[in-house]
Amino acid sequence: MSTNPIQPLLDVLYQGKSLNREQTAELFGALIRGEMSEAAMAGMLVALKMRGETIDEISGAADAMRAAAKPFPCPERNNNPLHNGIVDIVGTGGDGFNTINISTTAAFVAAAAGAKVAKHGNRSVSSKSGSSDLLAQFGIDLTMSPETASRCLDALNLCFLFAPHYHGGVKHAVPVRQALKTRTLFNVLGPLINPARPEFMLLGVYSPELVLPIAKVLKALGTKRAMVVHGSGLDEVALHGNTQVAELKDGDIVEYQLTPADLGVPLAQITDLEGGEPAQNALITEAILKGRGTEAHANAVAINAGCALYVCGIADSVKAGTLLALATIQSGKAFELLSQLAKVSGEALVNGQEKGR
């Protein structure tokens, strides 16, 4: 008889049965603490994938990772009803398209328009340049201390939280994930485990089949309001086609589609949004944020920032949010914000505030 406390839970999975939320949290807790062998880890991830993860299982895995994350000292939530929480603009990645850094650029625009944005991100998954790769080009310290990040959020309306800096236990799964060479539950967990615990989310997923399930997971995790989107192949709101949406609001989930016309912008081609290496994408982002980007680039960023502004209550519709985002882009305020964030990040390093992080 096995003395391994997690073996009975693994056996349930091997029988093709589901675990409840608490059981899944127990399994992933063991993984994060380094108490699970690579063989067991692979067996667990494959068993979940082959059957299809339930809402409870995804929520339980997120619970475990949230509980184990490095704490983030959130600044006091503003009592102003238009600024009553934090928003994240995030995607699962893995959509297979090499686009410009839309969600990261949109985060600067939304913050410059008044939203409190805590952007949780990582290095590239499917593109040549992930959010962290882009920010590094601007001299923004990816591993700034939680205290420095919190000060940035409070003073600048924006901070960037580098996932590996807050979720150290995930390192135990890296060899297995690399060896499996297939998507697993980890591919959808990233956006769900932001240590700032945002009340509002614009969350893009790589598959249309994930839109409704992930909205249900966000509801289970206590998210106040969210839009989960898949845009014609992209893990974000699409400029080149329809976007499938599951909107969580007041405890209810409503499904619908958005077109570029609904957002007040013209249709573009996916090729208009093709990105490159981090250095090239940084130049594109700089041009957009200075109000000098191409129409397609500006619109792609604006519709995503606009949906985030709608989700967090600053705009009363996605179209109004998009218009506000476009005006913010033209003002150049978003680039000023990027420059300020890079300056604060650099000063913290020079002053030694990042020691012991």
Swiss-Prot record:
- Binding, anthranilate 2: 177
In terms of Pfam families, this protein maps to: Glycos_trans_3N, Glycos_transf_3
Q: Which SUPFAM superfamilies match?
A: Nucleoside phosphorylase/phosphoribosyltransferase catalytic domain, Nucleoside phosphorylase/phosphoribosyltransferase N-terminal domain
Q: Give the transmembrane ranges.
A: none
One GO cellular component this record assigns the protein to is: cytosol
The cofactors named for this UniProt entry are: Mg(2+)
Amino-acid positions noted as binding Mg(2+) 1 in the UniProt annotation, renumbered to this chain: 103, 236
Q: Which residues bind 5-phospho-alpha-D-ribose 1-diphosphate?
A: 91, 94-95, 99, 101-104, 119-127, 131
Q: Keywords in UniProt for this one?
A: Amino-acid biosynthesis, Aromatic amino acid biosynthesis, Glycosyltransferase, Magnesium, Metal-binding, Transferase, Tryptophan biosynthesis
Glycosyltransferase in keyword set: yes
UniProt-listed InterPro entries: Anthranilate_Pribosyl_Tfrase, Glycosyl_Trfase_fam3, Glycosyl_Trfase_fam3_N_dom, Glycosyl_Trfase_fam3_N_dom_sf, Nuc_phospho_transferase
The UniProt catalytic activity note for this protein reads:
N-(5-phospho-beta-D-ribosyl)anthranilate + diphosphate = 5-phospho-alpha-D-ribose 1-diphosphate + anthranilate
Top-rank taxon, per record = Bacteria
Q: At which positions is anthranilate 1 bound? A: 91, 122
Identify the metabolic or biological route this protein is part of: Amino-acid biosynthesis; L-tryptophan biosynthesis; L-tryptophan from chorismate: step 2/5
What is the E.C. number?
Answer: 2.4.2.18
Residues annotated as binding Mg(2+) 2: 235-236
One GO term of the biological process aspect: L-tryptophan biosynthetic process
GO MF term list: anthranilate phosphoribosyltransferase activity; magnesium ion binding
Entry note: cofactor = Binds 2 magnesium ions per monomer.
**Record note on quaternary structure:** Homodimer.
User: Briefly, what is this protein's role?
Assistant: Catalyzes the transfer of the phosphoribosyl group of 5-phosphorylribose-1-pyrophosphate (PRPP) to anthranilate to yield N-(5'-phosphoribosyl)-anthranilate (PRA).
Tell me the protein's name: Anthranilate phosphoribosyltransferase
Gene source species: Shewanella baltica (strain OS185)
Q: What is the lineage of its organism?
A: Bacteria, Pseudomonadati, Pseudomonadota, Gammaproteobacteria, Alteromonadales
Q: What's the gene? A: trpD
